[in-house]
Swiss-Prot record:
The record marks G182 as: Plays a critical role for abstraction of the pyrophosphate group. The lineage of its organism: Bacteria, Bacillati, Actinomycetota, Actinomycetes, Kitasatosporales. Disulfide bonds: none annotated. Mg(2+) 3 binds at N224, S228, E232. A motif (DDXXXE motif) lies at residues 82-87. Belongs to the terpene synthase family. Its EC number is 4.2.3.181. Monomer. It is an enzyme of class 4 (lyase). It comes from Streptomyces pristinaespiralis (strain ATCC 25486 / DSM 40338 / CBS 914.69 / JCM 4507 / KCC S-0507 / NBRC 13074 / NRRL 2958 / 5647). The keyword Lyase applies. The Asp-Asp-Xaa-Xaa-Xaa-Glu (DDXXXE) motif is important for the catalytic activity, presumably through binding to Mg(2+). This is Selina-4(15),7(11)-diene synthase ((2E,6E)-farnesyl diphosphate cyclizing).
Length: 365
């Protein structure tokens, strides 16, 4: 048996923060899960011990308490879908049937009054979530939330096809899949709701703003893969993970794959920091708040990842760090060799050109 991997402290230049009502929110989310009977009794019993309310409180440390609670319930609901149907349920091996279920759930999210799936706990929970999204968000934010949920569902069906076939995608396909099946993009509208504003399309749809949101998703999901590798590798079922993809594609040992994954996420973290700081200098107060929330999302996922029993697995402890470092292992400005995301680094050249255009030409004597 190969020696157990030890995850070193990961690079994080972002400060830790948490909502002061985190303990109350965690209790409320556990009660919400019981009220709507999310997942099987066994799964629900696990989810309510995983500090999901605390995770939400780390994502929105200064947000409206009602939205922090909404986000916590939504994250738990997502785990009810992912753990209950995709990862551990039979539908996770039947992509066609899984697509049918998820398509029906999307209809419930779009039109909660539709008389369908009325005895389904996940549908009931989703109806409650949709009503609360309507209460705290605008019509545009609600529409983007539903659209992002569809993206998430689409990606987990793709993953289910690999699970059924027992195949591992290449790194580019895995990266593209992971940007969505980590359910990070579906959280983004709630970052705005949590602070009572709506980022306007002229800023939200800018290439650079979209890119930093994708970078945040990459960092969060790569970190999740690093933290969950111990649990997933020790399990008996099929699993997809960045380390496994790197092992297969590049012929690496688990230790080498861990080093490669850390290098990749460090390089993206450095790029995220540079581009988000540039955007903050020229953006509206709403954009600056959005960028701050992306940072909180990244750091919140990190702090939750090294502390939740979901990943520390006390019965079979993982060798996880208890702190983070402010020194990256890789601060190169060269693009990652992943076509789906290599264009992110084009933003550095675009910013340099923008700076040159702003510098007045020197007149000759």
């Amino acid at each position: 048996m190969e020696p157990e991997l030890t995850v070193p402290p990961l690079f994080s230049p972002i400060r830790q923060a948490i909502h002061p009502k985190h303990a109350d929110i965690d209790v409320q989310t556990a009660a919400w899960a019981e009220t709507f009977r999310i997942g099987s009794e066994e799964l629900r019993g696990k989810l309510v011990t995983q500090d999901i309310g605390t995770f939400s409180a780390r994502i929105l440390p200064e947000g409206r308490e009602e939205v922090v609670s909404l986000l916590a319930d939504f994250i738990l609901w997502l785990f009810g879908v992912d753990d209950g149907h995709c990862e551990e349920g039979e539908l996770g091996h039947r992509p066609g049937d899984l697509a049918g279920l998820l398509h029906r759930l999307i209809r419930v999210a779009q039109n909660p009054e539709a008389p369908m799936m009325q005895d389904d706990p996940l549908a009931a929970g989703l109806r409650d979530l949709r009503m609360r999204v309507d209460r705290f968000g605008t019509a545009g934010q609600t529409a983007r939330w539903v659209d992002a949920l569809r993206e998430y569902f689409f990606s987990v069906v793709w993953e289910a096809a690999h699970r059924r076939a027992g195949t591992v995608p290449d790194l580019n396909d895995y990266t593209l899949m992971r940007l969505y099946d980590g359910a990070t993009s579906v959280v983004l509208p709630m970052l705005e709701m949590g602070h009572g504003y709506e980022l306007q399309p002229y800023e939200r749809d800018r290439t650079a703003v979209r890119a930093v949101a994708e970078m945040a998703s990459f960092i969060i999901t790569w970190d999740n893969d690093i933290f969950s590798y111990h649990k997933e590798r020790r399990g008996s079922g099929y699993y997809l993970n960045a380390l496994r993809v790197l092992e297969q594609e590049r012929g690496l040992t688990p230790a080498q794959a861990l080093d490669a994954a850390i290098s990749q996420r460090d390089r993206v973290m450095c790029l995220f920091t540079t581009v988000s700081e540039q955007l903050a200098e020229q953006g509206s107060p709403q954009l600056r708040q959005y960028l701050h929330s992306l940072r909180c999302f990244i750091r919140g996922a990190q702090d939750w990842g090294i502390s939740s029993v979901r990943y520390t697995t006390p019965d079979d402890p993982a060798n996880m760090p208890s702190v983070f470092t402010d020194v990256p292992t890789d601060d190169s400005t060269e693009p990652l060799d992943i076509p789906a995301v290599s264009w992110w680094w084009d933003l550095l050249a675009e910013d340099a050109r923008s700076v040159r255009r702003q510098v007045p030409a020197q007149r000759s004597a």
